Amino acid sequence: MAKKVIGEIKLQIAATKANPSPPVGPALGQKGVNIMEFCKAFNEKTKDMVGFNIPVVITVYADKSFTFITKQPPATDLIKKAAGITKGTDNPLKNKVGKLTKAQVLEIVEKKLVDLNTNDKEQAAKIIAGSARSMGVEVVD
């Protein structure tokens, strides 16, 4: 018989930097989860993604056990890293802060495809290119 789910917690945590301080500790403590056990497991699982904020979905069961799923870093983080910028622009129509090649966009699509709401790489490339444009990053050939 399946365990009874009592809650689902969605967080974005820097890879390998989960610790009991806010926001992780209070969010998990409210559901009665062993915070240190989660932190150790999360840090171990994300050791190869250093430098990114990792979305994580934690499912908490009635017996206070948990499972978690890590997703790929947000598209904006991948775009910023590929374009070599620290942040996007506040006015993407006037200010361009960086450039991405189509090859870089396809590289981001390969990483992000499992989290996007499409299975078509061309459509996924349009989604990533749109995110880049809204940050003031040009997509060039």
From Swiss-Prot:
Protein source organism: Campylobacter concisus (strain 13826)
Q: Name the UniProt key words of this record, in alphabetical order.
A: Methylation, Ribonucleoprotein, Ribosomal protein, RNA-binding, rRNA-binding
Q: Please name the GO terms of the biological process aspect recorded for this protein, alphabetically.
A: translation
Q: What is this protein called?
A: Large ribosomal subunit protein uL11
Q: How is it modified after translation?
A: One or more lysine residues are methylated.
NCBIfam families given for it? L11_bact
Similarity remark: Belongs to the universal ribosomal protein uL11 family.
Q: What is the lineage of its organism?
A: Bacteria, Pseudomonadati, Campylobacterota, Epsilonproteobacteria, Campylobacterales
Q: Which SMART domains match?
A: RL11
Does the record's keyword annotation contain rRNA-binding?
A: yes
Assembly state and interactors?
Part of the ribosomal stalk of the 50S ribosomal subunit. Interacts with L10 and the large rRNA to form the base of the stalk. L10 forms an elongated spine to which L12 dimers bind in a sequential fashion forming a multimeric L10(L12)X complex.
User: InterPro entries, from UniProt?
Assistant: Ribosomal_uL11, Ribosomal_uL11_bac-typ, Ribosomal_uL11_C, Ribosomal_uL11_C_sf, Ribosomal_uL11_CS, Ribosomal_uL11_N, Ribosomal_uL11_N_sf
